[in-house]
Amino acid sequence: MFSNSKKKIFLYVLIAGVATFSFAFLVLNRLQAEEHSLAYVENLFLDPFIKQNESLAHANDRPFKLYLGIFSQAKNVDRRNFLRTDYNEYIKEFAVNDTVDVRFILGLPENEQELATIREEQRTYGDLAVLPIPENVDAGKSIVYFQTFLEGYQPFPLFSELADNLIMPSTQFHGSFIYNQSIKTYELPGMKEFQDLGEPKHDYDFIVKADDDSFLNLPRLFEMLKEHVGKSRFYFGRDCTRRELPTAVRDFPYMCGFFYIVSPDMAYEVAKRRNIIIPFEDAQTGYSIYLSGNVKNAEFSKCTLYDLILPNEGFNYRQSYLRIDAIAVHKLKSIPLLSTVSNWFKKMYEHRANCSALIETERLSCLQATIPLPSLDV
């Protein structure tokens, strides 16, 4: 009888011990899961945006040189003024140890008023790059842009008297396929034509082509570029497809034209092919890179490069709502819309900066919160 009682007591103690151990194990796992969750959210949202000192200290290890070419037109003065102010603020704060040169890329002016406007703007800011080609989207502007990164290229002499008479209407293709049309450029005396230019210059690690109706989330862009410093044959963007392309060229990969990045050697591959094969700028760029052969560092991104979902604009597979990890948000055709998107990102960064001052248990909930999406009826 006594022996059975001892067995029962031992069994109860054993069960209690196992239960206690299991409970402790579950609690410990829960705490570890919360720590991992917090670390994940911090990595996603805080670095490098909030932990600025740590981020900038890390930036000392891998400084980069970036040419940020924003494709614009002479008439888009207000858009350039907005982007110039906004981007320079981010560059001063988040690229302290890096080189970031912002330039607005223009074709030739269409009339004397445009010439006077861009001359005054250049006197004030000095950040315009005029190309010796009529203003266009798909008729060779990008190809000529990339030739500016070759040895021997001389900038267009905007203030020369010779430029007074170089007024040309914009040119566009209208949907028909152009299988072999040569680019015609209008170099002024002192400028070399393409065939007289040399090898790629390596003044920059990265060369960006972006449209002025896109907002670039520069802190996120800078963070991403740190991972690719020193890479050659680099091509980054959102992969696109066009059903309009003929079957023979439909399957090669290319990046959507509103934002992509190349290394200097890839810029040369685009610039040296002077004949337009495909009447879509982004597809022509991708095709030239494809023909070059070994593109060993092609990086495709979908979620961080997108068209903004807007009211009454229909839907396409490239669209998304605003998200903090975006690199480029496209289809911002008005200054109020650009301003709305820019302000949303600034408020999100401010909110997450405030989160960093909280204790860990409160910080997670703070980071999971988001600033309400703004009204986009602008």
From Swiss-Prot:
Lineage: superkingdom: Eukaryota
Glycosylated residues (UniProt): N53, N97, N180, N354
UniProt KW Cell wall biogenesis/degradation keyword: yes
EC class: transferase
Biological processes, Gene Ontology terms: 4,6-pyruvylated galactose residue biosynthetic process; cell wall organization; meiotic cell cycle; protein glycosylation
Positions of transmembrane segments: 9-29
Residue ranges annotated as Cytoplasmic topological domain: 1-8
Keyword terms of this UniProt record: Cell wall biogenesis/degradation, Endoplasmic reticulum, Glycoprotein, Glycosyltransferase, Golgi apparatus, Meiosis, Membrane, Signal-anchor, Transferase, Transmembrane, Transmembrane helix
CC per GO annotation: endoplasmic reticulum membrane; Golgi apparatus; Golgi cisterna membrane
Subcellular location: Endoplasmic reticulum membrane; Golgi apparatus, Golgi stack membrane
EC number(s) reported in the record: 2.4.1.134
One MF annotation (Gene Ontology) recorded for this entry: galactosylxylosylprotein 3-beta-galactosyltransferase activity
Segments in the Lumenal topological domain: 30-378
Catalytic reaction(s) noted: 3-O-(beta-D-galactosyl-(1->4)-beta-D-xylosyl)-L-seryl-[protein] + UDP-alpha-D-galactose = 3-O-(beta-D-galactosyl-(1->3)-beta-D-galactosyl-(1->4)-beta-D-xylosyl)-L-seryl-[protein] + UDP + H(+)
Keyword Glycoprotein: yes
Bilayer topology annotation: Single-pass type II membrane protein
InterPro entries tied to this protein: Glyco_trans_31
Family (UniProt): Belongs to the glycosyltransferase 31 family.
Reported function: Involved in cell wall biogenesis. Has a role in the addition of Gal-beta1,3 moeities to galactomannans and their subsequent pyruvylation. Has a role in meiosis.
Protein's recorded name: Beta-1,3-galactosyltransferase pvg3
Species of the source: Schizosaccharomyces pombe (strain 972 / ATCC 24843)
